[in-house]
Amino acid sequence: MSFTVQVKEELLLQSSQNKSELSAIIKLSGSLGLASSGLTLSISTENAKIARHIYELLLHFYQIKAEIRHHQKPNLKKNRVYAVLIEDGVNEILNDLHLADSFFGLETGISPLVLENDSWSQAYLRGAFLAAGSVKDPEKGKYQLEIASVYSDHANDLANLMQKFLLDAKVIERSKGTITYLQRAEDIMDFLLVIGAEETKTEFENVKLLREARNDLNRATNAEAANIAKTVNASMKTINNIIKIMDTIGLDQLSGDLQEIAQLRIQHPDYSIQQLADSLTVPITKSGVNHRLRKINKIADELTD
């Protein structure tokens, strides 16, 4: 089950019923038709449970028993499309939900009444997500939550609605419509709380924390590997210089303290500076070890091949 389906299934388990939720679903998934009896309304979804939810909302608010039909998407074996069909009382529904425009169509923006009321705003966002929302699995890639709109003014109104709850919503035009989206994990979690998906919000947060812990561990591992590589490279340079001294003038020409550090470095090429410092007959500081190694490198540089 995808994370999007998880969120939607949690929302469908809630007993809350609000006309603003139905309004959003119709706005984003509804289409008007004309029959001999007048206007018809068809609300489409690929989720059978959402189709049943729409049916129940219509029955609850308008005592209308809609018809649920389904058909297979062309060239797709699994995806069924469910259509909730209303043939009676469509004008009354549209007027009651403030969806009708003056040209027997659907208003493309969001009613100011929704924007002014917090509970209506939350219900509208819930309906919008049920109808046309998706959220990327937090385990995979970048975080993203989207709601697709046919009309750009609706997408912008949706962004304003999200911003009302302090969410950093943005809008982008795509070939098939306009997308209102959130990209910050914190905004996505807050959105899930706003629409009432508390369990999936908690799951999202747990996955996010696990991802961050993994990333921190990887960064620490990479940093440690880089430090080891740096130590080994510096060690090999010094070892090559010690070998050069041995082949030309011999280590016995060095002072006792330089001889000791040279022999330690040859014996333990993987030792860090601190490990070298601790292994000396008389332990010294890291800066003291670095000073001796620099002297060895300088002596080697001054020798002619």
From Swiss-Prot:
One of its GO terms (biological process) is regulation of sporulation. Residues 272-305 bind DNA. Keywords: Cell cycle, Cell division, DNA-binding. Disulfide bonds: none annotated. InterPro entries: Homing_endonucl (IPR027434), Sporu_reg_WhiA_N_dom (IPR018478), Sporulation_regulator_WhiA (IPR003802), Sporulation_regulator_WhiA_C (IPR023054), WhiA_LAGLIDADG_dom (IPR039518). One of its GO terms (molecular function) is DNA binding. Belongs to the WhiA family. Involved in cell division and chromosome segregation. This is Probable cell division protein WhiA. The gene is whiA.
